[in-house]
């Protein structure tokens, strides 16, 4: 499935995030419960190649954001090779691929993770830290590696327009990222109030049900009402 990430500046779609779904449309948790140590690498590779294939078949003209599992990547160059082959096969531009890693995912070796991210960047992929603020390691990871993008966790976003503590945290993250030249994406937007507060903070890339739900094997349309302030 694909969910749009919108750009409020010109009311366009900046990217689509590829989300895991089962063959019958089962949710991500149902699918991920079947992932084991034995099939983790194969699953990770299959997800990224299927995401690229699906995007090409849908004639996606935006960036494509793909989640990857750091613990499934043993040799970054092997994963990159298969990704490059998939992109070439389906004629999808390399510079429109974004790879997201979950800040909340337990990673045993952070040097390994930062090496993966650096190698991805060297090959022309954009990098992102997903669910930023959900775990305890986000700032440490940001200190070691500055991705192109971070995605604020929806727990920070929920009712942020009514919560002074969350507002202060979000403003602080935006300030830090501005100094580091890291673009902020707010995910999990579910209300006009959340959208408006975040826009006033200078966040222009957003994702969430307020704009569009994920579409299975399709590109979701953003309702015109979603933009109106």
Where are these regions (language model features)?
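Bacterial c-di-GMP phosphodiesterase EAL domain
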Residues: 1-90
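Short beta-strand/loop segments at the ligand-binding rim of alpha/beta enzyme cores
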Residues: 116-129, 177-185
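Generic structural signal for well-ordered alpha-helices
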Residues: 48-52, 80-87, 114-117, 170, ...
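EAL-family c-di-GMP phosphodiesterase catalytic domain
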Residues: 7-12, 102-107, 136-229
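Non-membrane alpha-helical structural segments and their capping/turn regions in soluble enzymes
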Residues: 41-45, 77, 110, 114, ...
